[in-house]
Amino acid sequence: MSVEVGSKSLSPWAPEFRHISFRGSIARDRFVYGHEPWEGNERGKVTLSEDEESFLRFLFKEAGLDLYRYRLKTIKRRIGACLRTLHANSFADARRVVQQKPALLPAAISTMVIGVTSFFRDGPVFEMLRNEVIPTLFKGRYGLAIWCAGCSDGPELYSLAMMLAEMKLLHRCHLLGTDCRWDAVRRARAGQFDAAAIKSVPAELLARYFTQQETHWRVKSVIRDAIHWRRADVLTLHEPGIWDLILCRNMTMYLTPEASAALFPRLEMSLRSAGALVLGKAERPLAACHLSTVGPCMYRRDR
């Protein structure tokens, strides 16, 4: 990606973006937590049969994911949908289908690891981003690095990109959306949504930044081309980089307490000093993290 400033073309890694660093790494042993299957009380409330657990371990391993980082209750109730997606009558059949047709793995994983999002979700959050957070982050800087972790099929990051375009700041930002599901990243990159999905987009933004295509609406290239999309798991991404703003909303509701406890330090360490983190309404960073509340769902790194 490059941006135009007058007659000058800038890469996100041009000198004007020199405060954005992707060097170094976050050592895995700083975020070690238990890998015993579903520690704590959850195992006592919900159980898996040996066949269920064996298949799920296989499926998640094939996708490069750790089954035991996800809440068992959520995983168990999605098993039937996964088998139906693979047109399998048994776990042995399902395993064989994935082995013989690896192209079906993304669809199978998408039935197990779900993501719910929408355009301009939680209006006050976007109001604060526009009126306070973004202007503050831009003080003394040419550009910002913004990461949406667990981006699903993209509505939240597209919302932010449209807001930045309205502020005449989009060309000065490097935006990245990541999700552990291939299908979600593919849909996000396509930027195509049905009528139900775009109901929360203000009419003037819909007219300015979308093109209607029969029964669907597609985000215009001026917005699509400003965003990079990547398939990655935030829990294992080894070098997330240093970001000015991170959005990671409602992810912990799908994770075990141990995985959630590992997630918040990773997010904190991925923020620059005074960088901003946006979480879901019911999420709170660990007390040990150096993150202070600055507004609804909004936190700032203090060191």
Show the residue positions of the predicted features.
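Residue-level signal for inorganic ion chemistry
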Residues: L129, I246, L271
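A short glycine-rich, Lys/Arg-flanked "PGG" loop and its adjoining helix->strand segment in the class I
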Residues: A261-S273
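Core SAM-dependent methyltransferase catalytic element
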Residues: L286-R303
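Conserved SAM-binding loop of SAM-dependent methyltransferases across substrates and taxa
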Residues: D153-K168
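Extended basic-aromatic, gly/pro-enriched interface segments that bind polyanionic ligands
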Residues: H171-L247, M251-A259, R284-L286, H290
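Conserved AdoMet
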Residues: I20, G24, D29-W147, G280
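Conserved beta-strand signature within the Rossmann-like core of class I S-adenosyl-L-methionine
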Residues: A274-K281
